[in-house]
Amino acid sequence: MSLPASFDLTAEDAKLLLAANVHLGSKNVIVHNKPYVYKTRPDGVNVINIGKTWEKIVLAARTIAAIPNAADVAVCSSRTFGQRAVLKFAAHTGATPIAGRFTPGNFTNYITRSFKEPRLVIVTDPRTDAQAIKESSYVNIPVIALTDMDSPTDYVDIAIPCNNKGKHSIGLIWWLLAREVLRLRGIIPDRSTEWSVMPDLYFYRDPEEIEQNAAEDSKAEDAEEAPVADAEPDWSGETEDVDWAESGATPAAEEAAASNW
């Protein structure tokens, strides 16, 4: 698929994709994903063509931007590494997030409280989000999925080839997708304007690590705010015991008495 020159992959975005290991696929390859393989390393890891990854990101963003109501786009992630990215994507684009376990019947059982009728579904992994894809096929909802080389593509309309198991890779793909959607909607005025949101915001963070960092910061603030106690003068009234005979010094009182005579 050829893109207009304005949609070409920039050197900065290519560096981000490589730094996040988006190009490192699985060792197994499904026949439908073979066109996305650039080459196979000696250790068996299939290297994904990031040029085709970018083309699919642009295609997916154009599909999302074509939906008038942003809330009609449902974004799902049962995988832990993708839940933060899904929530951030929904916050920036107005989509409806489904982070965590997908409740069966969300798209098919209208009696449930969580029933939704989206016009487009985006999933992080076709394996972990298989229930969402299955129900989408029942009600004719198109599906966009982040697919690794061993991911099934049944009922997936747009597959974005990438490493969908690493936390940095997942976060970066969702960030690039959100940025491209905002560009197409005109919220980001042109392609020369940098998006103020950093990719790190979409990366998964361990809750224990967050608590540990917060505890360390609070300790540092307490140490800075603690007042430093000044050295108090010694008013105990005790004097040093001096042996005047050994030192050869004459007490001041004796000197005064001798001078009077």
Curated annotation (Swiss-Prot):
Q: Name one Pfam family in it.
A: Ribosomal_S2
Alphabetized CDD domains for the sequence? RPS2
Among InterPro entries, the record links this protein to: Ribosomal_uS2, Ribosomal_uS2_CS, Ribosomal_uS2_euk, Ribosomal_uS2_euk/arc, Ribosomal_uS2_flav_dom_sf
A single Gene Ontology biological process assigned to it is:
translation
- Report the GO molecular function annotations: structural constituent of ribosome
Q: What GO cellular component term, any one, is given? A: cytosolic small ribosomal subunit
> Which family is this protein grouped under?
Belongs to the universal ribosomal protein uS2 family.
Report the protein name in the record. Answer: Small ribosomal subunit protein uS2
Its source organism is: Meyerozyma guilliermondii (strain ATCC 6260 / CBS 566 / DSM 6381 / JCM 1539 / NBRC 10279 / NRRL Y-324) (Yeast)
